[in-house]
Amino acid sequence: MSLQSIKYTRGSLEILDQLLLPVQSKYLPVRGVEDGWKVINKMQVRGAPAIAIVGCLSLAVEIHPEEFDSKKSLRQELEGKLNYLVSARPTAVNMKMAADELLSLANDLTKDDNVDVAAMKQRFLNATEAMLKKDIADNRAIGAHGAKAILQLVAAAAGAPMAGPVRVLTHCNTGSLATAGYGTALGVVRQLSELGKLEHVYCTETRPYNQGARLTAYELVHEKFPATLVLDSMVAALLRAKNVAAVVVGADRVAANGDTANKIGTYQIAVVAKHHGVPFFVAAPLTSIDLHIPSGDHIIIEERPDREMTHVGEHRIAAPGINCWNPAFDVTPASLITGIITERGVFQPAQLKETITKLLET
């Protein structure tokens, strides 16, 4: 059974504190928007899909017991809280898109004379809860599309009708801990395993926050997948020596041209994969694709505190007085990406804007 990082019933939300993993499994109550902002900003919950889900559900928990005098006052409350949640980690586009979707719903309901304030609140709660269910369904679809694409490429390269079990590499954490469940890039790995087509999965440590070593490795051991942890600096040697069939990573934001912002270190893995002729896939729901941003040059990159580089827990590991540069993400150019795996299929970066626009119109 997959790990459960988010526990929700109407009026109650708990998240698995990912800063304590893998040593301790502890759930934290999220009693409202302020708690939601803090757990997102402190990275106690992380992963673009999970950030959006937890942010929206924290608002649902906050307004659940409240009574509002008018639809206008409810709408104003929702707008202010949603904008605040978006500010917790601005690089991850999913929270912004979810906020825009919910605010659009609130605006429509405010204008609808057939809906009173109680019904408006109910409709809003229903919409936030539907996002939780949809994320899990979308992740399963991403897994199916991604596994199929990888196996087809491997079979074609071998001139065989069917691919055998494959070895894959992933970076950061994109599984049940980063989503509502199942995972994006790790969902592809999960689907390969379910098909009996996973020979081995390699995961990077993902410095400086060690999401790969702490979280992905934790999930892989939990699932009993054949898995090996490697240092970030070993990727070139790994691709040269271990016959890796594909790299599959997640995304925090994908620009209209296919440029992809993901956890720091993704860009260099893509460069190395290109050199070795290893297909490089990005797995992300449509909510991670921002067609309003023409290229990766326009993506705001969050910078994290020096302490995340200089300390492990309370122990300093870097020389006192050294300066640090600690961007949380980098941008992988579309030219290095083989395909972008979504819940609606796998798309080449050059076709992304046109294809997604058509999908959203249907």
From Swiss-Prot:
EC number: 5.3.1.23
Disulphide bond pairs: none
UniProt-listed InterPro entries: IF-2B-related, IF-M1Pi, IF_2B-like_C, Initiation_fac_2B_a/b/d, M1Pi_N, NagB/RpiA_transferase-like
Nucleus listed as a keyword: yes
Active site: D252
Keyword tags: Amino-acid biosynthesis, Cytoplasm, Isomerase, Methionine biosynthesis, Nucleus
Keyword Phosphoprotein assigned: no
Subcellular location: Cytoplasm; Nucleus
Entries under Gene3D superfamilies matching the protein: translation initiation factor eif-2b, domain 1 (1.20.120.420), Translation initiation factor eif-2b, domain 2 (3.40.50.10470)
Reaction(s) catalysed (UniProt annotation): 5-(methylsulfanyl)-alpha-D-ribose 1-phosphate = 5-(methylsulfanyl)-D-ribulose 1-phosphate
Primary localization: cytoplasm
Any one GO biological process: L-methionine salvage from methylthioadenosine
Site (Transition state stabilizer): C172
Gene Ontology cellular-component annotations: cytoplasm; nucleus
Top-level taxonomic group: Eukaryota
Metabolic or biological pathway: Amino-acid biosynthesis; L-methionine biosynthesis via salvage pathway; L-methionine from S-methyl-5-thio-alpha-D-ribose 1-phosphate: step 1/6
One Gene Ontology term of the molecular function aspect: S-methyl-5-thioribose-1-phosphate isomerase activity
Function of the protein: Catalyzes the interconversion of methylthioribose-1-phosphate (MTR-1-P) into methylthioribulose-1-phosphate (MTRu-1-P).
Family: Belongs to the eIF-2B alpha/beta/delta subunits family. MtnA subfamily.
PANTHER family: METHYLTHIORIBOSE-1-PHOSPHATE ISOMERASE (PTHR43475:SF1)
Protein known as: Methylthioribose-1-phosphate isomerase
Species in which this protein is naturally found: Drosophila pseudoobscura pseudoobscura (Fruit fly)
Species lineage: Eukaryota, Metazoa, Ecdysozoa, Arthropoda, Hexapoda
